[in-house]
Amino acid sequence: MSLSKQVVPTHRVEIAPNSESTCKMDHSNYQHNGLITKIWGTAGWTFNHAVTFGYPLNPTSDDKRRYKNYFISLGDVLPCRLCRESYKKFITTGKTALTNEVLRNRHTLTKWFYDVHNAVNNKLEVDYGLSYEDVVNKYESFRAKCGKPVPTVKGCVTPLDHKAFSFKKLYYMDAPIVSLDKVENFVRIARMRGISDKYFCFLELATVLNGDFNELKKQSSWEYRNKYCQKKIRHMRENAIPSIEEQGYWKGTPTIDELKLLLFLCSNLNRTEVNDAINNVERLESTHYIEN
């Protein structure tokens, strides 16, 4: 069996059920604030990527004008002031500028919006490791395909098996990635905090593959990794679980839940926050709070 086909068994790990929120807030004092980006952002990206994949293969002058106006206007209506300012800057400068060449055909427009999405992620210091081809494969799976005509239904009827495949693609979410060399800084502290061995299985696979995400994506455990990480992230958000310890012995280092994410080469933290956490772990070691 080739290295790329090797699979290290990954034990299934469970996530505790959500606790009911007791937060009661008077929203009247916040009516002029924007909306939380992590709530509307994913849906916004999905819709606007879909808009670009609906662009004609050979657009007319009217098509180009309408789509250009749409993407320019988008910068005026995003429900977050900083997002609006950032988006407007991206579409007017550098390789993410919305030029006439961008509107040449479907390929150029979809590639442009992919670059915009990456530029935003880079500014936020997060990485998902998705290539343009990955995005194309996902959104092309959403394209309607006609099966046998049904007398009682007008228009194209998409076969159920194709719909099922498309919905699986829609609901399958990629989780953020963190490089193996960064995660290795947290392995010792994860073991010291009593995290079960079953959480280290994916890390063992990543080590065998030298942290190569292209190879990791070929493994059957990659899909499970993404599903687990997305469930863990959701669990932390819905239960207000922090990513960094705020007090006590481990202050400044990742919480238990965040360490479990890191062992799957994932994190809620951005690049700067991961580096800060590494520095805090090293500081503990240097001051002998963590015994050798």
Curated annotation (Swiss-Prot):
- Give yes or no: UniProt keyword Cytoplasm: no
Give EC number(s), comma-separated.
1.8.3.2
Q: Which reaction does it catalyse?
A: 2 R'C(R)SH + O2 = R'C(R)S-S(R)CR' + H2O2
Compartments annotated for it: namely: Virion
The cofactors it requires, by name, are: FAD
Q: What does this protein do?
A: FAD-dependent sulfhydryl oxidase that catalyzes disulfide bond formation.
Q: Which PANTHER family match?
A: ALR/ERV, FAD-LINKED SULFHYDRYL OXIDASE ALR
Q: What is this protein called?
A: Probable FAD-linked sulfhydryl oxidase R596
Species: Acanthamoeba polyphaga mimivirus
